[in-house]
């Protein structure tokens, strides 16, 4: 697991809750580095946010994770927003 801070923007790849921890695998959007595992302390609001994002991921909805403590209801400031698909004009 990474000991670095969460990136400002990221793609969520995987989520697993084990006991009092939530393990997430994510890819930093602003970096060419490999995806990293982060272990977060459990909270109900964080789990709810990550479950919604995981469901979107399974349903093929493109989302971006962001850190914004001003609008988030969890300790880490994690929020997700949906990205519209850009379809080229024919």
Q: What would you call each of these model-derived segments?
A:
Residues 1-18:
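Alpha-helical transmembrane signal-anchor/signal-peptide segments
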Residues 17-20, 62:
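Charged, low-complexity intrinsically disordered regulatory/assembly segments
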């Amino acid at each position: 697991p990474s000991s670095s801070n969460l990136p400002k923007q990221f793609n969520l790849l995987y989520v697993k809750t084990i006991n009092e921890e939530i393990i997430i695998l994510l890819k930093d959007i602003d970096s060419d580095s490999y995806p990293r595992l982060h272990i977060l302390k459990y909270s109900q609001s964080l789990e709810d946010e990550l479950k919604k994002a995981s469901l979107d991921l399974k349903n093929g909805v493109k989302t971006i994770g962001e850190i914004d403590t001003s609008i988030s209801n969890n300790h880490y400031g994690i929020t997700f927003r949906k990205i519209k698909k850009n379809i080229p004009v024919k």
